[in-house]
Each structure stands twice: as C-alpha cells, then as structure tokens.
C-alpha cells in the first residue's frame, strides 16, 4: 500500500457487541440463503455461566462463540457499515474480521475515522482508540499526532499489519529480523526433538512452522534477504537431525 498514513483500528470484543437484530436483518437481505438457519440459531438466547454468579447470563448481542457461522454472520452484519464508509470515498480501507484499517493522507483518514466512530455503534461496532495504531511512513510523526489530537493512539513508523509488516524500511527490517530470530529458535527446538522423533518434528515443520515465514515472504517486500540465519539453521541443524547425518 502506497499510502502516506495507515491507521490500524481495533475494537474490543466486536463479535460479542455486534447488534444481533440488525445483523440478522442484514443477513436476510444480503445473505438470504443462510438467513433462516441463522434466525433459528439465534432466535433464543444462549446461556452463559459465570463463576460466582448464581443465575446464567443470557447472550442477547453479538455472535455465539463456537458457532460455525459466527464469522460469516459477523461479516455480513458489518457489511453495510463497510459499504457506507466506502461510498463516502474518504480513503482506501481494509477490513479483516473485526479489525479495520484505512490508508491515505492524514485529512481523509481522520474523516474516515470520525465517520467510523459516529456510525459504528449503530451496527454494534465500538472503536477503541487506545488499541489503535497510526503508521507514518514518511517520518512526520508530529504532524500525525496533531491531526489525531485528543485520541489516545500509538504513533509508529512501522508495525505488523495483517501478518506482515508495513512502514519505514529500516523499522520494518528491524521487526523482520526480530521475527526471524524467533523462527531460528523454533527451528533449533524442533531440531532437538527431531533427534528422538524425526517424523513428528518434520510434520510440525512443514505443516505449521514454515507456513509462517512463507506468508511473510509473500506479503513483505524484500523479506527473503533477512532469511539467511533461518536458512542456515535449517541446513545446519534441522535437516541433519531429521536424517540422522550431516547434509
């Protein structure tokens, strides 16, 4: 994303605060094929048992944890909000589950934020500034702080974003190197396990661990250049432990 500012916005427990009645109605209009099933699922109130409370608490808002369609219902429930913000053309926005972000110049991003704060509660979406981040790519931190004055937000030059990293090149490289260091430690731990359980360690490696850096290499430009310590750990420690001999 080539935006000069990127605002990453989080809202706490959004799945629990979603306006259920509005979400079910939106599903009736936008996802009619599943609307009857969702209505039957949520026509009653799930009981929540809280330690120290004699009577169960009835879940009247949001989606129920464990519901296979909870994520899909939430997505349809906030879709009108997403479309409303998009139609006003403030800036480029990205939504993933209950996390929202917007990229662009500082003025339009602030207008997008004001609209989100104003319209979000109507859909059960309650933004929380203290858990939000403003990524400033060109080093103008003071300008960004002035634009978002009054909001307890974090201002950085680089940060994680949707599993990758975004921001100033040097800062992104530092974050990436820290991530690679943790991967090297994980590979070394798997190498120790591979001496006794080589097949299990190999399955953990190909099914889980390598997927992490495989994704980062796809979404972070130049990530492969920082992977040399990881390549060395795999070649010198993990593979010899799996095969029981030097490679």
Predicted regions mapped to residue ranges:
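Nucleic-acid-interacting cores, centered on viral/eukaryotic replication and modification enzymes
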Residues: 1-247
């Amino acid at each position: 994303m080539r935006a000069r500012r990127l605002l990453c916005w989080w809202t706490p427990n959004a799945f629990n605060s979603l306006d259920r009645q509005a979400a079910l109605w939106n599903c009736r209009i936008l996802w009619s094929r599943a609307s009857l099933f969702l209505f039957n699922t949520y026509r009653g109130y799930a009981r929540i048992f809280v330690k120290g409370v004699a009577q169960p608490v009835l879940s009247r808002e949001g989606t129920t944890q464990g519901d296979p369609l909870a994520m899909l219902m939430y997505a349809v429930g906030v879709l009108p909000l997403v479309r409303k913000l998009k139609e006003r053309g403030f800036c480029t926005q990205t939504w993933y589950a209950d996390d929202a972000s917007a990229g662009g110049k500082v003025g339009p991003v602030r207008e997008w934020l004001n609209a989100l704060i104003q319209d979000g509660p109507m859909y059960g979406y309650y933004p929380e500034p203290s858990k939000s981040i403003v990524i400033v790519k060109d080093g103008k931190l003071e300008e960004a702080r002035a634009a978002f004055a009054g909001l307890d937000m974090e201002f950085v030059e680089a940060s994680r974003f949707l599993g990758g990293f975004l921001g100033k090149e040097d800062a992104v490289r530092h974050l990436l190197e820290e991530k690679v260091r943790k991967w090297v430690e994980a590979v070394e731990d798997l190498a120790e396990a591979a001496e006794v359980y080589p097949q299990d360690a190999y399955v953990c490696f190909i099914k889980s661990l390598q997927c992490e850096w495989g994704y980062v290499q796809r979404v972070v430009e130049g990530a492969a250049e920082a992977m040399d310590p990881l390549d060395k750990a795999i070649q010198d420690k993990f593979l010899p432990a799996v095969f029981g001999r030097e490679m």
